[in-house]
Amino acid sequence: MNHSQQVPSRDQLLAKTGVLLIVDQITPPSGPVAKGVTPTVKERELALFIAVSDDGMVYAFNGHVDLGTGIRTSLAQIVAEELDLRMDQVHMVLGDTERAPNQGATIASATLQISAVPLRKAAATARRYLLQQAALRLGCPPEMLRIEDGTVIASNGSTLSFAELVQGKNHQLHIADDAPLKAIEDYRLVGRSAPRVDIPGKATGELTYVHDMRLPNMLHGRVIRPPYAGHDSGDFVGNSLLAVDESSIAHLPGVVAVVVIRDFVGVVAEREEQAIRAAHELKVSWKPFTGKLPDLSDVAQAIRDNPRVQRTVLDQGDVDGGIANASQRLSRSYLWPYQLHASIGPSCALADFTAGQIRVWSGTQNPHLLRADLAWLLACDEARIEIIRMEAAGCYGRNCADDVCADAVLLSRAVQRPVRVQLTREQEHVWEPKGTAQLMEIDGGLNADGSVAAYDFQTSYPSNGAPTLALLLTGAVEPVPALFEMGDRTSIPPYDYEHMRVTINDMTPLVRASWMRGVSAMPNSFAHESYIDELAFAAGVDPVEYRLKHLSDPRAIDLVKATAERAQWQPHTRPMQTQAEGDVLRGRGFAYARYIHSKFPGFGAAWAAWVADVAVDRRTGEVAVTRVVIGHDAGMMVNPEGVRHQIHGNVIQSTSRVLKEQVSFEESTVASKEWGGYPILTFPELPAIDVMMLPRQHEPPMGSGESASVPSAAAIANAIFDATGIRFRELPITAERVRAALGGEGQGPDAPAPAQPSTKRSKWWFGSLAGVFGAALGMLATALPWRAEIAPVTPPGVGSWSAAMLERGRQVAAAGDCAVCHTVSGGKANAGGLAMDTPFGTLYSTNITPDPETGIGRWSFAAFERAMREGISRDGRHLYPAFPYTSFRNINDADMQALYAYLMSQTPVRQEAPANQMRFPFNQRPLMAGWNARFLQRGEYQPDPQRSAQWNRGAYLVDGLGHCTACHSPRNLMGAEKGGSSYLAGGMVDGWEAPALNALGKSSTPWSEDELFNYLSTGFSEKHGVAAGPMGPVVSELATLPKSDVRAIAHYLSSLEGEPQALAANAAPQVDTHVSLSNGERVFKGACLGCHSDGLGPKLFGVSPSMAVNSNVHSDLPDNLLRVVLHGIPTPATRDLGYMPGFKDSLSDRQVADLAAYLRHRFAADKPAWQGLASKAAQVRANPGSH
């Protein structure tokens, strides 16, 4: 492991006594620069590569970092080989700016091919020196000495350890180009598979990842990003902040600071959860943002419309003449989508800006470039900044790892304490520099003899280096667009075309973008290899044979032949030659490439060839890559098994990119905010991978990391063509694209669902309240609009009631759910203030604690009982029937007295309820007198002598204390609960559907008494789902009741025999044409399946409800499902259920609509399709309700 803080720095080693140092003067690379900009030549510096210490340690240093590719192991093998050490005797240090040489960014798989060369020479230099020193001491020629495990051994048995040879002096040697390298025939480590040195520490939980790094006195930070995600240029960048209201989080515990520098806004707190909450609740005002991204609904056209600067990197023969004279012209366009680096863990960093020194623990891919950016940001010398590189959550390219380091530095500077910052998942996905889209256009064709007439290739690459975000937000750099010459990787095809022209269209980004694995080479090779496949079939020649005709590179020819042989390739000249297996079509595709990386003309890395086998379901359009045979020639393989690991990883990642990955945009903003909106390949979808590595141990090592992925897209697309006869020139090749290309045959996820019935459910009681007042006016002659005040009394003493009565009162209060409506989130129980939004205004629940001024402390029992039974307050005012006195009138006297005693014995809370905000005429309380005269019945509940005691107890609790009809019965035009067949037939409350309870045994998934009992007791039923919304706190209260009472409620409800709602018979199938069920399926698999896997996945946090039987999915209305998806279940009904996150900050209205439509189609296919889901999702998002 790289416990680099325990390793002396370069300066410490240079000053140390008892050490052999192998150094060299190097000129640090400048890093990528914009087109037309002259790179800044940095001063030469002394770089340290090898340190042999008298404490027995051998340190080796390389400026690149290990991204999970295993270079720490391979580099250690190289050093150990040259110095005849064991692997455990080499401490490999990577990337740390105070220790490792500045060898530039870790990109293009260039570590072993380029950056390891000086390290190997340094080890050879050290070996020669140590042998020379030993020869002098032992009095024998160096040829008579050998080295074993760090000890020099003479032929007579005399020994000297490395530590002894370097004692007492500081030996500094420059790398000697003439130092003899070990003969390949003598290798004992290089060329043999070695276990990864990093795996044991990761497997046993050693401190490895930057996310786990902690320091004493450390604080936690979070950042609030501006509204222009996806942009890194424009006048608004760094100039959009209006105000930050620090008072909005003044009440939160643990907040240390709010840091504002132009558009950079961050919060610092003592604990991480405090920082998260502060960032969420801090009120930040931004200027209205109108600078939207270009219209990316048509990415290809957006690229074509983007200004460009052309450069031709190859022009040979007569391209125009060849095209003009072609017997068959083929003009093709290929499109690569925007993709994410998709780091599994959001970027994280820890900065310590104290005592004049700045230290940053980072997962960066570019430590030295990051140090330069931070020096620019802080306007200080680079020497003050130390980057300590730790491993991160996986990224090949430029994600937000550097951005978050700058965030942490700014926050640490503000508070002068170490600060750890981690981005949210949404920030990582939205703000990371995307892997850019790329458009490749080819014009060419065939001659009459099947030879290539001409090849005119253009590639357009809208990307650049994506400046570190804090530099832009703080105004340290100007937000001007820049052109980077990075679209030319592997732009020249590997084939010998006589007439060929290659043109690069350099352009500024459409979206914040930067390099990603296979920078421009994967897209370019997708076009090259798809096009030659088309040429082969058009010429009537087998695709492998056709490639071989146009290859002259001997190693390429050997690889193509060997790979075809390994895969048992069957020559063919037409697609669809494999017998279909029912609805499954099978095909094979071939592709070859050599990755050419770095600044044009670049360097050639490893050669790679793919044979991909696919299965295509022509009914659903689903594509499975079932097997990949991959041939690979990387020259000398330092660690063959490590190379194999890299190839496997590349196959998996590139298959995911070809079949699934695409950033989605809505209204010109990034919509892929989490895994539901950006699906990646899952374990069940992995292909079988057969790796064939050509033995080339006498050849120089070539970069192998990215090379294996370069032919991937074309191989898979060519295989799909072989299976279906259809060419796909745009990625990803998703099921809906395949199904559409196949003519829409079959039943895919988008197949029509049954029709939506025309019947509509009634709304919350205010929905039709307008009719109340017209009727009430006609009743004023017989109803009293004003009632007498009942005089206030002195609050009863605390000891006025027995413990038994108080316990009975507690149970009555629990059964009546008093605290559910009379307590705000985070507030004192029963102190009121809960807002209840209605179409006609807002009501606020009252304070029912015994406070004499703001509560019911001066209410007599008579006043309390009148309010409960008649809806009249102590002062004579009418209450709105949102307070369910129409049910509470059923409560018997003993329970009413117990409830009064319980409430009056609670701790008083002085809290004035906000004034109701009802619009005229609904704010005229006297008008409720007529309503009461018409709909309020009198008297307590009377038991049914024909029924059991349990049934009667259940009816009493349901119709009285529990006031279930208040939510679960529909209302008439005057807002009163309907009876008869409509009793408990369902209703709406606070935007939630309260389902029908009067025919539970006849519902689509029948409720048994036991299921209902379990649900009411725990909030969960395996056959129906989880209690959410207003039902959650109801269950919480029911859980405190005697089990016999809950059983009585279940018994009573299960006995009801209402009429189940019938579906429209033989209705014409309808589908909401504005939703994509395929996209909904992807969202479900990416965001939901981990928990809702029908028992197939792990049980992690509480229950994992099945969507197949979820009542919300089978409901006539989508409201409850949408509310749970968007707002989650932040407070579960009982602790064992587990928390469900809401996705309102992660999924757009369209994505939520697609998800809901898919769930309905997948799990309730016999029900009518929901309509207008996107608008309904927007409505639910804007109106979260109070539950």
UniProtKB/Swiss-Prot annotation:
Lineage: Bacteria, Pseudomonadati, Pseudomonadota, Gammaproteobacteria, Pseudomonadales
Chain positions recorded as heme c 1 binding sites: C818, C821, H822
Outcome of gene disruption: Cells lacking both nicA and nicB lack the ability to hydroxylate nicotinate. Cells do not grow in a nicotinate medium but grow in a 6-hydroxynicotinate medium.
Organism for this UniProt entry: Pseudomonas putida (strain ATCC 47054 / DSM 6125 / CFBP 8728 / NCIMB 11950 / KT2440)
Domain statement: The cytochrome c domains probably enable interaction with the electron transfer chain, possibly by delivering the electrons to a cytochrome oxidase.
GO terms of molecular function: electron transfer activity; heme binding; metal ion binding; oxidoreductase activity, acting on CH or CH2 groups
UniProt entry keywords in alphabetical sequence: Aromatic hydrocarbons catabolism, Heme, Iron, Membrane, Metal-binding, Molybdenum, Oxidoreductase, Repeat, Transmembrane, Transmembrane helix
Induction, as annotated: Repressed by NicS in the absence of 6-hydroxynicotinate (6HNA) or nicotinate inducers. In presence of 6HNA, repression is alleviated.
Stored Pfam families: Cytochrom_C, Cytochrome_CBB3, MoCoBD_1, MoCoBD_2
Pathway where this protein functions: Cofactor degradation; nicotinate degradation
Name of the protein described by the UniProt record: Nicotinate dehydrogenase subunit B
Catalytic activity reported: 2 Fe(III)-[cytochrome] + nicotinate + H2O = 2 Fe(II)-[cytochrome] + 6-hydroxynicotinate + 2 H(+)
Function noted in UniProt: Subunit of the two-component enzyme NicAB that mediates nicotinate hydroxylation, the first step in the aerobic nicotinate degradation pathway. Mediates conversion of nicotinate into 6-hydroxynicotinate (6HNA).
Domain Cytochrome c as annotated: residue spans: 804-907, 949-1057, 1075-1163
Enzyme Commission code: 1.17.2.1
Residue sites binding heme c 3 per the record: C1088, C1091, H1092
Membrane topology, from the record: Single-pass membrane protein
Gene Ontology annotations of biological process type: nicotinate catabolic process
Cofactor: record remark: Binds 1 Mo-molybdopterin cytosine dinucleotide (Mo-MCD) cofactor per subunit.
GO cellular component terms, semicolon-separated: membrane
Residues passing through the membrane, by range: 764-784
Principal location listed in the UniProt entry: membrane
Subcellular location field: Membrane
InterPro entries in the cross-refs: Ald_Oxase/Xan_DH_a/b, Ald_Oxase/Xan_DH_a/b_sf, AldOxase/xan_DH_MoCoBD1, AldOxase/xan_DH_MoCoBD2, AldOxase/xan_DH_Mopterin-bd_sf, Cyt_c-like_dom, Cyt_c-like_dom_sf, N-heterocyclic_Hydroxylase
Record's keyword annotation contains Iron: yes
